[in-house]
Design a protein with these regions (language model features):
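Catalytic cores of nucleotide-sugar-dependent glycosyltransferases that transfer UDP/GDP/TDP-activated
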Residues: 1-173
Length: 173
């Protein structure tokens, strides 16, 4: 187990945000701690993975990252990356309002610009970028896959169910 203390990156947050803007058009200028804390931590994890690649792992690594919070790690290492989302950031925000997400996903038309209206623009852009630049993009269900395709405009490469169908297994009672 490795614990990552990213507090040393506090003074570098603006530089990291600039890098994200210049390389990926992620607009995080007006974000707060709910974006910046995961940004620092994930960025630090990416630096750690890069160092481990150089010193210990020798090309034997595939990094599996979950949710937008882990996206910045991908900026710092060369190993193949799998990015998984369990639900999109914008989908979660829309689901907590009167927006008919199910219908919009069914018709494949969720306007990404809604992320700004719902206060999740930078998180949405980070998630979309992570899905785009990963070597494999996965979701945890067919429904989440449809949501990701409609919201992020990125079709998942694979569905990796995060559970199993209990009806297919005999009861242990």
């Amino acid at each position: 187990c490795i614990l990552v203390d990213a507090s040393g990156l506090e003074r570098d947050v603006d530089d990291i945000k600039t890098e994200m803007w210049e390389k990926y058009d992620i607009d995080s200028l007006e974000t707060g701690r709910d974006f910046e804390e995961p940004l620092k931590w994930s960025y630090a994890v990416g630096l750690l993975i890069d160092r481990l690649e150089d010193e210990k792992l020798e090309g034997e690594t595939v990094v599996h990252l979950h949710e937008w919070l882990s996206g910045p790690a991908m900026f710092n290492f060369d190993s193949p990356a799998v990015f998984t989302t369990h639900a999109t950031v914008l989908g979660r925000a829309l689901s907590n309002s009167d927006f008919d997400l199910r219908n919009a996903v069914e018709h494949g038309n969720v306007d990404g610009s809604l992320a700004e209206d719902y206060g999740v623009k930078a998180k949405h852009q980070m998630e979309q970028t992570a899905a785009e630049i990963s070597d494999a993009f996965t979701t945890v269900s067919k429904n989440t896959g449809k949501e990701a395709e409609a919201v992020l405009n990125v079709k998942p490469d694979k569905i990796l169910p995060n559970g199993f169908n209990v009806d297919e297994y005999p009861s242990l009672e």
